[in-house]
Amino acid sequence: MAYATADDVVTLWAKEPEPEVMALIERRLEQVERMIRRRIPDLDARVSSDIFRADLIDIEADAVLRLVRNPEGYLSETDGAYTYQLQADLSQGKLVILDEEWTTLGVNRLSRMSTLVPNIVMPT
């Protein structure tokens, strides 16, 4: 069970969602919790800190809210003379924890870049 609740997401959203959206929020909170546990296996031990717990709840709620606000991942929509555009950070359409949120949770970014230095031995 996620540390954040559907009420945390609704509070950040500042509007009352429909019942089917509440079910989506609950499901996505479970998913975001699993995402975090894969990167932080000792999550339950870290939550003993009140500051870490508050950050975790905020991050889980924010990640789910980004998705619930724009579940289809649209960037813009036009209907006749009316155009509606969302912020680019809301347009992914999938559950994502941002790099700065991982840093807040104490997880360093995964860097896959490396440098290869050749060791050339010249024939004598």
UniProtKB/Swiss-Prot annotation:
Which Pfam families does UniProt cross-reference here?
Phage_Gp19 (PF09355)
Entry superkingdom: Viruses
Q: InterPro entries in the record, alphabetically?
A: Mycophage_D29_Gp19
- The protein's name is Gene 19 protein
Source species, please?
Mycobacterium phage D29 (Mycobacteriophage D29)
**Its gene?**
19
